[in-house]
Amino acid sequence: MRCIPRGSALDLGTGEGENACWLAQQGFTVDAVEVDPRFTLQLAERRGALPVRVCPSDITIFQIVESSYSLIVASAILHFLRPTELWPLADRMQQGLTPGGFLIAEVFTADDPGFTVLRESGTEEIEPNTFRLEGRSGVIHYFARGELRRVFEGLEILEYEESRRLAEDPEVAYTSGALLVARKGE
């Protein structure tokens, strides 16, 4: 984290704002984007005097100003988009980074047990590896091996890892995901 230049950060799909508040404590001025009004209210209270601006918006329509963020975080949010929504957003995210700015993204991958459950249950697959869900998110996309890396291939990939982790939910043995850390060239 020390090598990331301080400045403005963008936290997409911030939820309750845990990452946004932590980033603000590390010296960033944070735009925290969240569509769920319950979470935006919680974050508005949680942030206190921290430099966190709550942006109530769907991430697919949030206007990312070109070259304005030294850090963009998309933790556990991009898999709730269809690939046809993901690629245009990924382009805007890359354009939104300042020269030398960093991007951190984390997603579910197709070897996650949830993928198998949805496929075997007959849940409607609306795009490859993308299933229609009931509820707020509407869809879930499980990234194929190397897909997250390809989405952000315009950046210098500093770290890319696909792994399985023990799940917090005792009914699920593990989760599978991909983590990407990348940097925009000077």
What residue ranges belong to the model's regions?
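A short glycine-rich, Lys/Arg-flanked "PGG" loop and its adjoining helix->strand segment in the class I
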Residues: 87-99
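Class I (Rossmann-like) S-adenosyl-L-methionine-dependent methyltransferase catalytic domain
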Residues: 1-10, 15-64, 81, 88, ...
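Short catalytic micro-motifs in class I SAM-dependent methyltransferases
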Residues: 76-80
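A conserved beta-strand element that flanks and buttresses the S-adenosyl-L-methionine
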Residues: 73
